[in-house]
């Protein structure tokens, strides 16, 4: 598929087909594509936590997302939670001090580049995605046992669209 077509095809999906599953291999393909994005000094501090079983997805939705996003990702057969290790990207290794005023902003920047690669690869594979930033960080951290050394940024629902997005 032409790159321009992928860019134009990608849409936020809020209506997933619950009858179509996404394989572990497809999720691994998305994460591999994400990891090819540029990052500060190639430090690759982004982390991906995947919720793939239907019962765990339902439990995660109920415990970690507000009602609006519970509805928005209903039927999605995969959730990918994206984080990055704080205090590394944009920081001097020797002193631990930020190299400029952006500080951990560079970690957000790198993860944003990687998340875009992930969702564009999903579009190429005819998968739909929805990036959700409204979520309960402490509930996610507890549910997935994410260490305090990582900043939780987004939850990405992945699945097949139930209808063609407009």
Regions found by a protein language model. Name each.
Residues 43-46, 124-127, 153:
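Short secondary-structure junction motifs
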Residues 69-80, 145-166:
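A glycine-rich helix N-cap at a beta->alpha junction
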Residues 11, 55, 135-138:
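Alpha-helix/helix-capping structural signal
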Residues 84, 134, 160:
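Short secondary-structure boundary segments
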Residues 13-37:
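An N-terminal domain-cap segment
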Residues 30, 34-35, 80, 95, ...:
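Small-aliphatic-rich amphipathic alpha-helix that forms the alpha element of a beta-alpha
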Residues 3-13, 18-21, 88, 154-166:
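C-terminal helix-cap and adjacent tail motif
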Residues 26, 42-112:
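Glycine/small-residue-rich phosphate/adenosyl-binding loop
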């Amino acid at each position: 598929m032409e790159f321009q077509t992928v860019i134009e095809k990608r849409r936020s999906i809020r209506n997933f087909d619950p009858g179509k599953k996404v394989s572990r291999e497809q999720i691994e393909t998305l994460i591999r594509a994400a990891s090819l994005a540029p990052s500060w000094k190639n430090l690759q501090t982004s982390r991906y936590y995947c919720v793939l079983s239907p019962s765990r997805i339902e439990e995660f939705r109920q415990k970690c997302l507000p009602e609006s996003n519970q509805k928005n990702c209903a039927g999605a057969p995969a959730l990918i939670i994206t984080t990055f290790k704080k205090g590394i990207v944009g920081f001097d290794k020797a002193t631990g001090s930020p190299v400029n005023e952006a500080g951990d902003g560079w970690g957000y920047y790198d993860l944003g580049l990687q998340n875009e690669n992930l969702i564009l690869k999903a579009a190429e594979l005819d998968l739909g995605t929805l990036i959700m930033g409204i979520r309960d960080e402490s509930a996610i951290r507890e549910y997935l046992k994410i260490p305090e050394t990582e900043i939780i940024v987004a939850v990405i629902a992945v699945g097949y669209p139930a209808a063609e997005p407009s």
